[in-house]
Amino acid sequence: MANKQDLIAKVAEATELTKKDSAAAVDAVFSAVSSYLAKGEKVQLIGFGNFEVRERAARKGRNPQTGEEIKIKASKVPAFKAGKALKDAVK
């Protein structure tokens, strides 16, 4: 499994940037995607995929410790849907 440091190293290798500059670039991309999602906007990267915010409806659940039925409030969650090129690359 690759982590953020692995991604930074890969970006540095591919772009000939320093690891420090690559880390700044990776952080900037993550920050930009987070910012758009926080405003409820979709981020579409052609060929790679789409980041979006999805609504989760209110629902009933159970407290696993007591078995008591509880109400779970509606919420918004970030979601990613892979694009065709990414799906094809993984096959």
Swiss-Prot record:
It comes from Streptococcus mutans serotype c (strain ATCC 700610 / UA159). One of its GO terms (molecular function) is structural constituent of chromatin. GO terms for cellular component: cytosol. The keyword DNA-binding applies. PANTHER family: DNA-BINDING PROTEIN HU, DNA-BINDING PROTEIN HU-BETA. InterPro entries: Hist_DNA-bd, Histone-like_DNA-bd_CS, IHF-like_DNA-bd_dom_sf. This is DNA-binding protein HU. The lineage of its organism: Bacteria, Bacillati, Bacillota, Bacilli, Lactobacillales. Histone-like DNA-binding protein which is capable of wrapping DNA to stabilize it, and thus to prevent its denaturation under extreme environmental conditions. Also seems to act as a fortuitous virulence factor in delayed sequelae by binding to heparan sulfate-proteoglycans in the extracellular matrix of target organs and acting as a nidus for in situ immune complex formation. It comes from the Bacteria.
